[in-house]
């Protein structure tokens, strides 16, 4: 059985204190603990990582196995990182792009995602619930294999 990877991109380590009007007051640790508990309860392995370094994120994606599932919040890399996009395409695993805020209701540059076209879905605007919904989908996908 595959593993679920939850990869958080730049500045997400500041959740809870970074622009709470846009990203909420929930910390990254709180979000991660909810995800870890839900996956553990379902008996599915999960790995959760955060980085502010694009190359490190790409290395984690490269280490994924063919039966794994990716939940990714690429942060600002969403809008321009063809390197992250190509990494996801290279490993050929299902992926969901997640955002806490509704990127389509924000500044014009945030409305474009170069990552979403290589993902099976995108969930945004629901705060920490965006991650929880993505995990529900990933758990269902992995248990049906």
UniProtKB/Swiss-Prot annotation:
Keywords, comma-separated and alphabetical: Amino-acid biosynthesis, Aromatic amino acid biosynthesis, Lyase
Superkingdom: Bacteria
One Pfam family it belongs to: DHquinase_II
Keyword Lyase: yes
GO biological process, alphabetically ordered: amino acid biosynthetic process; aromatic amino acid family biosynthetic process; chorismate biosynthetic process; quinate catabolic process
MF terms (GO), sorted A to Z: 3-dehydroquinate dehydratase activity
EC numbers, comma separated: 4.2.1.10
Gene3D superfamilies noted in UniProt: Dehydroquinase, class II
Site (Transition state stabilizer): 18
EC top class, as a word: lyase
Pathway(s) annotated for this protein in UniProt: Metabolic intermediate biosynthesis; chorismate biosynthesis; chorismate from D-erythrose 4-phosphate and phosphoenolpyruvate: step 3/7
Nuclease listed as a keyword: no
Subunit structure comment from the entry: Homododecamer.
Function: Catalyzes a trans-dehydration via an enolate intermediate.
Protein name per Swiss-Prot or TrEMBL: 3-dehydroquinate dehydratase
Organismal lineage: Bacteria, Bacillati, Bacillota, Clostridia, Eubacteriales
């Amino acid at each position: 059985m595959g593993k679920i990877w939850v990869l958080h991109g730049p500045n997400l380590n500041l959740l809870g204190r970074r622009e709470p009007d846009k990203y909420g007051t929930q910390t990254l640790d709180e979000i991660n603990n909810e995800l870890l508990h839900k996956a553990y309860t379902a008996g599915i392995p999960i790995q959760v990582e955060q980085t502010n370094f694009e190359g490190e994120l790409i290395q984690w994606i490269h280490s994924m196995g063919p039966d794994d599932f990716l939940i990714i919040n690429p942060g600002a890399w969403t809008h321009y990182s063809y390197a992250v996009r190509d990494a996801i395409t290279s490993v050929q695993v299902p992926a969901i792009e997640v955002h806490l805020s509704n990127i389509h209701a924000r500044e014009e540059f945030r409305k474009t995602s170069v990552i979403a076209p290589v993902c099976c879905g995108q969930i945004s605007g629901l705060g920490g619930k965006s991650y929880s919904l993505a995990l529900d989908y990933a758990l269902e996908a992995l248990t049906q294999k």
